[in-house]
């Protein structure tokens, strides 16, 4: 009940209450998630971070990390040294985020840290509300060299460019997520028919077998 309540509160825009209840994701079988076994204390805003090293670790999907990493610069502003742990495909992208001292791939050795926080607990720690969501104008910087490489590869732009992903990441180790993944996937042919009359250029950003 608490887990479903958190989703309802977040959907209603009651973020502070919703993210408080969202911590139930670690305690309900419905999510299939287990709290990480880390000896260092969990930080949820209850003590000063000045001079401390905090490990921020990825959870759930890569899209969740891309959305919630916007809170990481706020840790830096509190005087923390930030170590971010994310899946390999996100390492390069996250290196362009302000306030990060080090980005490491999930599964690699982690340097010393004093406390930790799961990525999706950051809004709770910073008492997120609709009025204080940080960096609404952008927070990730693209590598200029890679940006130029793709500009040269794609050539002059005649129309707006839109990237498409139509299939979520399948995880063989999480059968509890299979039905959720199936519900959110879209058939590419259906998308193509819907977009035929739109004056834009579409590019596939899909990775893995569905591509």
Residue ranges and their predicted role:
Residues 1-211:
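Alpha-helical solenoid repeat scaffolds of the TPR/TPR-like class and their adjacent stem/linker regions
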């Amino acid at each position: 009940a608490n887990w479903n309540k958190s989703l309802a509160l977040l959907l209603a825009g009651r973020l502070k209450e919703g993210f408080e209840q969202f911590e139930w994701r670690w305690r309900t079988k419905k999510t299939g998630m287990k709290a990480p076994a880390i000896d260092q204390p969990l930080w949820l805003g209850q003590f000063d971070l000045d001079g401390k090293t905090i490990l921020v670790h990825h959870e759930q999907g890569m899209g969740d990390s891309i959305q919630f990493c916007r809170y990481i610069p706020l840790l830096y502003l509190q005087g923390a040294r930030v170590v971010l742990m994310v899946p390999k495909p996100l390492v390069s992208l996250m290196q362009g985020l302000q306030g990060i001292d080090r980005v490491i791939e999930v599964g690699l050795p982690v340097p010393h840290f004093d406390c930790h926080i799961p990525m999706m607990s950051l809004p709770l720690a910073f008492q997120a509300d609709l009025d204080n969501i940080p960096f609404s104008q952008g927070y990730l910087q693209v590598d200029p060299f890679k940006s130029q490489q793709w500009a040269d590869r794609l050539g002059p732009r005649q129309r707006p460019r839109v990237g498409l992903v139509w299939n979520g990441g399948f995880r063989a180790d999480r059968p509890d997520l299979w039905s959720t993944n199936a519900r959110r996937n879209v058939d590419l042919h259906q998308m193509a028919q819907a977009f035929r009359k739109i004056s834009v250029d579409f590019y596939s950003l899909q990775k893995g077998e569905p591509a």
